């Protein structure tokens, strides 16, 4: 087995299980890809996988990352595609073996990190696009889902900027209103 994928508990305010609706069993690369395409959810998190070391290293080298590139966002999605295409035998286990605690203050939920998240998503997309001769339906699904995430981050970033502009205008308005009232107050004997 080159890659073992399993279900996980994901906790936030309530406990839930990440379900992919994939039958437990051993798959070859193509069969597993077809199962993922049916669910339309690659579930690319690395914490729900056990990977053979040589497959992991080959997948990482396949990305051909430059040393100056540092990625804190979407790195799981970046590595997931080469891992999947390099794994000949994949076993899917329906039993949850891991509990992931969602941190509300993490980089993915931090409004101040939106601009960095957008840039890192763009880097991940560009690195994935640079992989040669490996364009499969799974590749296009991952690119599609990453572009949707990127669009959401960009919309949140733009919304935040609009809210910030509105906030600044509101402060200025209140400031001038205060000055005007102070001016009128000083006119009254």
Task: Please report, for each region that a protein language model flagged, where it lies by residue.
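Non-membrane alpha-helical structural segments and their capping/turn regions in soluble enzymes
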Residues: 74, 114-122
């Amino acid at each position: 087995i080159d890659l073992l994928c399993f279900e996980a508990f994901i906790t936030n305010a309530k406990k839930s299980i990440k379900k992919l609706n994939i039958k437990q069993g051993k798959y070859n690369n193509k069969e597993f890809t077809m199962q993922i395409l049916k669910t339309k959810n690659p579930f690319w998190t690395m914490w729900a996988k056990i990977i053979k070391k040589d497959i992991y290293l080959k997948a990482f080298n396949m990305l051909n990352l430059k040393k100056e590139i540092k990625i804190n966002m979407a790195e799981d999605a970046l590595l997931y595609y080469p891992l999947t295409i390099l794994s000949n035998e994949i076993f899917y286990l329906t039993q949850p073996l891991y509990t992931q605690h969602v941190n509300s203050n993490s980089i993915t939920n931090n409004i101040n990190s939106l601009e960095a998240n957008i840039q890192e998503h763009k880097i991940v997309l560009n690195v994935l696009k640079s992989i040669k001769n490996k364009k499969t339906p799974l590749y296009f699904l991952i690119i599609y889902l990453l572009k949707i995430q990127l669009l959401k981050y960009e919309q949140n970033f733009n919304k935040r900027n609009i809210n910030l502009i509105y906030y600044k205008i509101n402060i200025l308005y209140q400031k001038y209103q205060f000055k005007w009232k102070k001016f009128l107050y000083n006119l009254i004997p």
